[in-house]
Amino acid sequence: MKFKFQRKYLSIPYVLFLLLFVVVPVLIIIYYAFTNKNTGEFSFIHLQNFFSDKTNIDVLIISLVFALANTIICLLIGYPIAYILANKKINKNKVLIFLFIMPMWINFVVRTAATRELLTWIGLGGGRYPEFATLVGLVYNYLPFVILPLHSTMLKMDKSQIEASYDLGANGFQTFTKVIIPMTMPGIVSACTMVFMPTISSYVISDLLSEYNIVLFGSYIDLYFNQANWNFGSFMALIMLILIGISVLITRKFSKEDSTRASLW
């Protein structure tokens, strides 16, 4: 009897990878999040401790504010850049894209340290303006993750729809809001997902650039794990996972919009 190879067997390594490096770690986090550190028994003590401490709530809110601000700023800067690159000649396009990708080849910590030195040199570092310095670092590190998906989406835009909107009497603003944005919505959603979610858990940028004046949620998680308080650290990590899941559900709502529905009405 010959063994018939089926294509479904190709998914086995992928399934094993997900089980070992996604499902099992999440289950471990959930286990530690709802067990007492001293007794090992099931407990909601970490839930109570988290919401009873105002500092935890403040850090969570600050992290969400920075994540939202970083996403908005990256979109405002990255969208026109991606649009310009998508309308450049192919040779110039490749060179400019390379210039934006090149910093990503440098180690994340090295890039952040270089940003700190630059801000200090121009008088904006050293903890003088921690909020501004942190935002600069976040935007610098995550801007390429906005430009690349937007650029890829814009290259696939149907230019005839843009021309048709002008032929039908639409002005530039109407064409942008009613035609271009709907066609590039998949890229916008992808960009927001790739920036907002990592920013929530980021802590190296805020620690280095704000001189530890800005404490984000990721810093708190790192603090508790370094103190060997795995249980409370796991509970905070679980909260972060829930927030990321909520953001994914929100962005999926927009990603389901068909970009071909662009119109003037």
Identify the function of each model-found stretch.
Residues 1-5:
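Short, Lys/Arg-rich, polar N-terminal cytosolic tail immediately upstream
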Residues 157-161, 259-260:
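Short glycine/proline-centered loop/turn elements that form peptide/ligand docking sites
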Residues 168-169, 182:
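Glycine/proline-centered hinge or cleavage motifs at structural transition points of membrane proteins
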Residues 165:
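The alpha-helix within a helix-turn-helix
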Residues 254-265:
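Short cytosolic juxtamembrane segments of multi-pass membrane proteins
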